[in-house]
C-alpha cells in the first residue's frame, strides 16, 4: 500500500527518539502499528535474505531496519537495531561528539552467524570508528550482541576515515573488510575467521582513491579542509564469476536536490586488487567506470550502493535523490545484467 510523504514523515516523527537520562530512548507514544511503504525513505541501504524474508538496514538512529517478503512492500520496524537506541559506551569514547545517529551499516552471514558492521562519526572529521554486532538470526530483533570496535581512525594519526564498512569473503573463505570516505580513499584489511576482527598483523591497504586524478576543478569537501578533493566513499564488493567487482560512490551525497552522487565500478581477479576499470585504469590512481548517475528527471543523483545475488536474480540497490519528491532520499532497486565480457549493466 502507498503512503504519502507527509503521512510517513508524521509517523516517523511520532516514533522519533527523545533524550532522557543522557541517552536516546523511544518516546512513550512511539509507533505501535506497522507501517508498510513501497518507496521507503533511506540512506545507504544494505540487505540480507533469510527464510523467505528480506531485511533492509540503513543509516538512522540506532540503525533503521525494515522487512519485506517481495522487495516491493516494506514494513518499517519501529525499533532500531539497537534497542531504545542504547549505543555501546565505547562508541562515545572513541568518537567525541557522536550521537545515536549511526551511518552506513553492512550485514553478512558467515559461519552460521550474522554480523553487522556500522559507522560512528561526525561530519567533516575522520575521527571515526566501525563497530561490530553479531546475531544468530535476523528475525531475533533483540538478539544483537556488541562485539566491540573493528577499526578506528584518528584525525592526528590516520589519513583515512573509518566509516562505510563492507564485508566480503574471498574464494578461500577468508573474510575481509573494506571502508573509507575522502582522505586517502578506500581501505581494505583481512579479518580473522574465528573472531571477525582484524587479523593479527594485518595492515590497511588503499584499493581506490580519487585525488590522483589531479582534476583542478574538483570540488573540495565543504566540511573539512583536510579531506581534500578525494570525493570517493561507500565501497561495496560483489563476487561474480571469476571477478570481484568494487563499487564506489563519487562526489557528494546528503544535499537533497543539490546532491551529485554517482556510482563507479572496477573489477579484479583478486579480492585485494588491483581493481581496474573498463579502460584498464587502476582505481588506486583515480580509475573507475561510471555505472550510474542521476537522470535529472526522476533522480538528481544516486549513490551508496549494495549488490546481491537473490533467489530471483542479481540486484543493485542504492539511495536516490528524487526530483518529484524535492530531493528526498529513497530506495532505488535495479536488476543487474551481465555482458559477455563480464561487465554489468543496470536495467
Predicted regions and their residues:
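Sec-dependent signal peptide recognition
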Residues: 2-9, 20
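Carbohydrate-active catalytic/glycan-binding domains of CAZyme proteins
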Residues: 3, 22-347
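Generic detector of low-complexity/intrinsically disordered segments
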Residues: 9-10, 346
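Hydrophobic residues within membrane-embedded alpha helices
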Residues: 10-11, 39
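Repetitive helical segments and hydrophobic/amphipathic motifs
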Residues: 11-14, 201
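C-terminal segment of classical bacterial N-terminal signal peptides
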Residues: 15-22
Amino acid at each position: 500500500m502507498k503512503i504519502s510523504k507527509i503521512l510517513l514523515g508524521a509517523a516517523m516523527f511520532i516514533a522519533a527518539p527523545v533524550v532522557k537520562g543522557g541517552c536516546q530512548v523511544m518516546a512513550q507514544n512511539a509507533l505501535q502499528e506497522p507501517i508498510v511503504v513501497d518507496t521507503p525513505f533511506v540512506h545507504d541501504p544494505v540487505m540480507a535474505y533469510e527464510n523467505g524474508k528480506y531485511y533492509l538496514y540503513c543509516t538512522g538512529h540506532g540503525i533503521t531496519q525494515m522487512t519485506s517478503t517481495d522487495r516491493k512492500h516494506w514494513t518499517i520496524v519501529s525499533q532500531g537495531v539497537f534497542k531504545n537506541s542504547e549505543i555501546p559506551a565505547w562508541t562515545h569514547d572513541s568518537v567525541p561528539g557522536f550521537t545515536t545517529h549511526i551511518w552506513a551499516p553492512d550485514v553478512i552471514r558467515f559461519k552460521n552467524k550474522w554480523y553487522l558492521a556500522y559507522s560512528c562519526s561526525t561530519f567533516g572529521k575522520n575521527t571515526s570508528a566501525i563497530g561490530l554486532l553479531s546475531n544468530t538470526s535476523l528475525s531475533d530483533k533483540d538478539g544483537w550482541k556488541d562485539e566491540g570496535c573493528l577499526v578506528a581512525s584518528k584525525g592526528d594519526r590516520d589519513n583515512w576515515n573509518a566509516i562505510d564498512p563492507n564485508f566480503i569473503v574471498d574464494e578461500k573463505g577468508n573474510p575481509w573488510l573494506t571502508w573509507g570516505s575522502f582522505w586517502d580513499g578506500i581501505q581494505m584489511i583481512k579479518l580473522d575467521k574465528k573472531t571477525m576482527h582484524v587479523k593479527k598483523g594485518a595492515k590497511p591497504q588503499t584499493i581506490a582513491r580519487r585525488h590522483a586524478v589531479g582534476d583542478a576543478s574538483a570540488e573540495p569537501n565543504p566540511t573539512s579542509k583536510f579531506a581534500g578533493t578525494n570525493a570517493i566513499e561507500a565501497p561495496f564488493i560483489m563476487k561474480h564469476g571469476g571477478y570481484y567487482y568494487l563499487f564506489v560512490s563519487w562526489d557528494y551525497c546528503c544535499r537533497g536536490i543539490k546532491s551529485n552522487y554517482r556510482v563507479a565500478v572496477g573489477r579484479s581477479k583478486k579480492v585485494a586488487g588491483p581493481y581496474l576499470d573498463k579502460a584498464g585504469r587502476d582505481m588506486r590512481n583515480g580509475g573507475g567506470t561510471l555505472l550510474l548517475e542521476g537522470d535529472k528527471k526522476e533522480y538528481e543523483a544516486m549513490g551508496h550502493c549494495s549488490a546481491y545475488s537473490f533467489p530471483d536474480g542479481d540486484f543493485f540497490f542504492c539511495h536516490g535523490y528524487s526530483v518529484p519528491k524535492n530531493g528526498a532520499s529513497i530506495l532505488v532497486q535495479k536488476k543487474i545484467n551481465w555482458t559477455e565480457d563480464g561487465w554489468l549493466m543496470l536495467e
